[in-house]
Design a protein with these regions (language model features):
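Beta-rich ligand-binding surfaces for carbohydrates and other polyanions
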Residues: 2-460
Length: 460
C-alpha cells in the first residue's frame, strides 16, 4: 500500500507540474523565473495580468497588461516589434533589465535602464503599475506608469518638465487591432503659465481641453471636481502633472480609465460588472465643434446650431464663398475698426463712444491666453487700456486671462465653461439683441443663446 501511494503521489505531482507549465500565473519575474507565451504575471488582487496576446484580425504576438480580460489591454511592451510566433519570453536580463526575447533569444523590447543592479525583479502593484525594482532594497528603477501606451489609469500622472520639455504622454494605437504607435498623442502643454491637455495628430493640434484651474479643465463642458476627481499642479521638482483617483471602496465598479483611441478620441470608460466589459462615459469628440479651430479665427462653434460656425458680433467671413460652402477655417475679420486703433493711427483724441466688450457666456475660451494675477475689474481695465488686447476672461483659480492675437477655438456650451469678453467697436455693440453675425443674417433660437452685452466705458 505504501508503494502504491508513493506512485500515485509522484503521478499527481508530475501532472500538476505539466498543468502549471502550460498556463501558470506567477507574481514575480526574476532572472530565474521567466514567463513564457502560455504563462502570465498577475497582480495580487487578480485584476491586472501581464502576458502574451494576439489582437483581433492579427497573427502577431505582443506582451501587454490587461484589466480582467484581453478585451481591455491597457499597456503594451513591444508595440513596434511584434513577435510572429509563440516562442517569446519575458525575463530579467544579465544587466538587470526587464526584457522581451524572441525565439532566437534576441531582445525585442527592454526597460533600458542604464544603471541597474544585477539583483532585480519585476512585479505588479495593485494599481496596475508594473515595476522593476532592486530585490534587496526595493528601490524602483523603472515603472510602466512612466512609459504609458494609450491608457491613463488611476494614479498615473501625465506630466511635462518645465525645463526640458520631457513628457509623459499617451500615444494611440495604429488601429483597433494594431497596437503599434499611431498618429495621435495626448499630453500636457504649458504656455505662459497656462496648462492645458492637448491631443495632437502628428504635430498638428487636434483637440484642446481649455485651461486647467487646479481641479478641472475649463473647456470640458461637463467636467466637475466632484465627479472627476482630478488633481495636479507643480510638483516642486520642475514638473507639471495631473492625475485622478477613484475610491477603493467601489471595488471593480470604481475602475475608470481614459483611453486614446486610434481615431484621436480620448474616451472615459468604466467597468460594467454586469456585462463584464468597459462602458463609455465620455469622449473628447462628440461633434465637429470639438475639432481644434474648425471655425477659424474670431468665430464660435455651436454644435446645436446649423451651420455650426458663426462669426462673432462685429465680424464677417474672411472668404464669403468658402463660408457659404461651410468651409470655415479662413475665419472672420472685423467689419468696423476699433476706436483705439483709429486714435492710435490718426493721433486724435478719444471721443465719448469708446470701445466695449461683448460677453459670451459658458464657452471654451480661445487658445493662447496670457495670464496675470489680478482681480476681475483690473483684468477688464488692463484689456481696455491695451489697444492690442482683443478679449479677456477671469476665472477664480486661474486669475486674469487676456488675448492679443486671433481668437481661435471658441466653443459654445450649454453649461459650465467660462465667460469671455470680446472687444468691439461702440457702433457694433449698441444693438443689444444682435448677438452673432451670420453671413446669411440668420439668428439662433433664443433658448440656445448664452450671450449678453455689457458696456464697460473707460473712466477717464
Amino acid at each position: 500500500m505504501g508503494s502504491s501511494s508513493c506512485v500515485k503521489f509522484v503521478f499527481v505531482f508530475i501532472l500538476c507540474c505539466h498543468v502549471l507549465d502550460v498556463g501558470t500565473a506567477i507574481d514575480t519575474i526574476t532572472s530565474s523565473q521567466s514567463i513564457k507565451d502560455t504563462e502570465t504575471l498577475t497582480s495580487t488582487d487578480g485584476n491586472f495580468t501581464l502576458g502574451f496576446f494576439t489582437p483581433q484580425n492579427s497573427t502577431n504576438r505582443y506582451v501587454g497588461i490587461w484589466w480582467k480580460s484581453q478585451s481591455t489591454v491597457i499597456w503594451v511592451a513591444n508595440r513596434n516589434q511584434p513577435l510572429n510566433d509563440s516562442s517569446g519570453i519575458v525575463t530579467i536580463s544579465e544587466d538587470g533589465n526587464l526584457v522581451v526575447l524572441n525565439g532566437h533569444k534576441q531582445v525585442i523590447w527592454s526597460t533600458n535602464v542604464s544603471k541597474t543592479s544585477f539583483n532585480t525583479s519585476s512585479q505588479f502593484s495593485d494599481s496596475g503599475k508594473l515595476v522593476l525594482a532592486e530585490t534587496t532594497t526595493g528601490n524602483i528603477l523603472w515603472d510602466s506608469f512612466q512609459q504609458p501606451s494609450n491608457t491613463l489609469l488611476p494614479g498615473m500622472k501625465l506630466s511635462i518638465n518645465k525645463s526640458t520639455g520631457k513628457k509623459v504622454e499617451l500615444t494611440s494605437w495604429e488601429s483597433p487591432y494594431n497596437p503599434s504607435v499611431g498618429s495621435f498623442s495626448s499630453s500636457l502643454v504649458q504656455r505662459k503659465n497656462i496648462v492645458e491637455l492637448f491631443i495632437f495628430n502628428g504635430t498638428q493640434l487636434y483637440w484642446r481641453s481649455g485651461p486647467w484651474n487646479g481641479g478641472i479643465f475649463t473647456g470640458i463642458a461637463y467636467m466637475s471636481t466632484y465627479l472627476n476627481g482630478f488633481k495636479g499642479g507643480d510638483d516642486g521638482e520642475g514638473n507639471i502633472n495631473i492625475y485622478y483617483t477613484v475610491s477603493s471602496e467601489l471595488g471593480p465598479l470604481g475602475f475608470l480609465i481614459y483611453m486614446l483611441n486610434s481615431q484621436g478620441r480620448l474616451e472615459e470608460k468604466w467597468w460594467d460588472d454586469e456585462k463584464q466589459e468597459m462602458g463609455l462615459m465620455w469622449a473628447s469628440r462628440k461633434s465637429d465643434c470639438d475639432i481644434y479651430a474648425i471655425c477659424g479665427s474670431f468665430a464660435i462653434c455651436n454644435a446645436q446650431s446649423s451651420p455650426i460656425c458663426s462669426c462673432l458680433k462685429g465680424f464677417e467671413p474672411r472668404n464669403k464663398e468658402e463660408w457659404n460652402r461651410q468651409h470655415w477655417t479662413s475665419g472672420c475679420v472685423r467689419n468696423t475698426g476699433l476706436l483705439c486703433e483709429r486714435v492710435k493711427d490718426q493721433n486724435t483724441s478719444i471721443d465719448t463712444n469708446e470701445d466695449g466688450f461683448l460677453e459670451l457666456q459658458m464657452v471654451k475660451v480661445p487658445d493662447f491666453p496670457e495670464r496675470s494675477p489680478v482681480d476681475p475689474d483690473k483684468c477688464r481695465s488692463q484689456c481696455l487700456e491695451n489697444c492690442s488686447c482683443v478679449a479677456y476672461s477671469h476665472e477664480e483659480m486661474i486669475g486674469c486671462m487676456s488675448w492679443t492675437g486671433n481668437l481661435l477655438d471658441i466653443q459654445q456650451f450649454s453649461s459650465n465653461g467660462l465667460d469671455l469678453y470680446v472687444r468691439g467697436a461702440y457702433t457694433e455693440l449698441e444693438h443689444g439683441m444682435l448677438l452673432l453675425n451670420h453671413f446669411n443674417h440668420s439668428f439662433f433660437e433664443l433658448h440656445s443663446l448664452y450671450f449678453r452685452f455689457n458696456f464697460f466705458l473707460h473712466n477717464r
